[in-house]
A protein has these predicted regions:
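Extracellular glycan-modifying ectodomains
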Residues: 1-184
């Protein structure tokens, strides 16, 4: 799978993935962790922007459909390739992407009278669980298909840590979980 961008001659994802696979194989590594902001390649952000199209072919045709098909092909091939060398895969579902940066959220949740963060305001600014799940629905659907078929393919769902009571929290009174809207 390759990102569709102008600098693929310098930053070739396909070559990097192959090089990493050979490294794992050579070093006889038994567990590999797959971590990314997956929707960056399948859906973009909540508004559909910030989308990095990918392709499974050597073409530059950009579309959401092509990127999603390529993601599925890449996931399937990755699982098969690592299974063939007896490597257990751990797929981390992406952390909930927030609507606002951590800085903005804390500035707008700060109670000047009490000189502290108002947790209720912070919770209200945090992304809704359903909105988060809707954005991730395509990736989760594809991942679950393989999870149910392959015993060497495991998933770790970070929503269990970040989400509660219909919200995926950006942080608490003492600290933010995020550096911005989508990086921990």
């Amino acid at each position: 799978i390759q990102s569709i961008r102008d600098d693929t001659h310098k930053r070739n994802c396909k070559q990097l993935a192959q090089k990493f696979y050979e490294f794992v194989k050579e070093k006889k590594i038994k567990k590999v962790f797959l971590i990314s902001r997956w929707t960056y390649y399948t859906d973009g952000e909540y508004n559909g922007r910030q989308f990095a199209h990918i392709t499974s072919k050597d073409n530059i045709f950009q579309s959401k459909k092509n990127s999603r098909n390529s993601f599925n092909i890449g996931l399937k091939n990755t699982i098969e390739n690592y299974k063939n060398i007896n490597v257990e895969l751990y797929f981390f579902h992406q952390v909930p992407m927030q609507l606002f940066s951590a800085k903005f959220a804390y500035q707008n949740s700060f109670d000047k009278i009490n000189n502290s963060v108002d947790q209720d305001k912070l919770n209200n600014i945090s992304v809704d669980f359903e909105k988060n799940m809707k954005l991730q629905s395509f990736v989760r659907k594809k991942v679950n298909i393989y999870k149910n078929k392959e015993s060497s393919f495991n998933t770790i769902d970070l929503n269990e840590f970040f989400c509660e009571d219909k919200k995926c929290l950006i942080g608490n009174k003492n600290f933010s979980f995020y550096a911005d809207d989508d990086h921990l």
